[in-house]
Amino acid sequence: MEDLVDELYGVDEQGSSSAAARKRRLTAEQVRALERSFEEEKRKLEPERKSELARRLGIAPRQVAVWFQNRRARWKTKQLELDFDRLRAAHDELLAGRAALAADNESLRSQVILLTEKLQANGKSPSPSPAPAEQTAVPAAPESAKSFQLEEGRCLYDAAGSTTTTNGGGGGVAMPAARVAAARAASNDSPESYFAGARSPPSSSEDDCGGAGSDDDYPSSSVLLPVDATLVGDAFEHAVAATVAADEEAPLNSWEWFWN
């Protein structure tokens, strides 16, 4: 405590033992003036500045020099303490950051180990079979498509009585109603249906096979067909011929042709 007071008031320790009676304490006003001067310049005290302060404060130049020397030493010590505190705080901050990084590293390492185990487990498990590919329908050949369309062709009747037949190319060909009727009669009706209500022409005794004539007069009587069968065959041939000639001209009705 006494050393601190001596430093504050500029007491020379070397001369304290030999000249204790000559010790002179600095007043509070002198200490404040020296503090203000030290705050203005913390560098080494120049001789001119030292002489001026000693003359203005009424103390010896040596006492001013000793006070500045002690005050500069305390200031340096305080700066070292402040620097040490700053370094310690920075060190503690770095240690905390290192601990956080170590924790993050450990967490990432555990995640990597877990993911590696999962990948290994998935690699050992059988892989799911791929879904069967959808079978694409193979388009039919042009020839088969045309034949199919020809087989599936149908007749569409319009209001005028004509008929449209679809061909293989998708277009329509108009057909007369008479031709269609004749074709239907030839394909669907039996030959006997043409003569359902007709009467056979009268036959004479000469035409009968059981007449008075001899076998020489009728050489071909054994191969003659009945009259009804002959007429039926002629009617069927006429129906086919009427179907073929329907495009050129409109034929007479099959019944009218037969009776005419």
Curated annotation (Swiss-Prot):
GO terms for biological process: positive regulation of DNA-templated transcription. Residues 19-79 bind DNA. Residues 1-24, 121-145, 190-221 are annotated as: Disordered. Probable transcription factor. One of its GO terms (molecular function) is DNA-binding transcription factor activity, RNA polymerase II-specific. Residues 1-10, 205-218 have a biased composition (Acidic residues). It is found in: Nucleus. Keywords: DNA-binding, Homeobox, Nucleus, Transcription, Transcription regulation. GO terms for cellular component: nucleus. Belongs to the HD-ZIP homeobox family. Class I subfamily. The lineage of its organism: Eukaryota, Viridiplantae, Streptophyta, Embryophyta, Tracheophyta. It comes from the Eukaryota. This is Homeobox-leucine zipper protein HOX25. Residues 78-122 are annotated as: Leucine-zipper. Expressed in roots, leaf sheaths and blades and panicles.
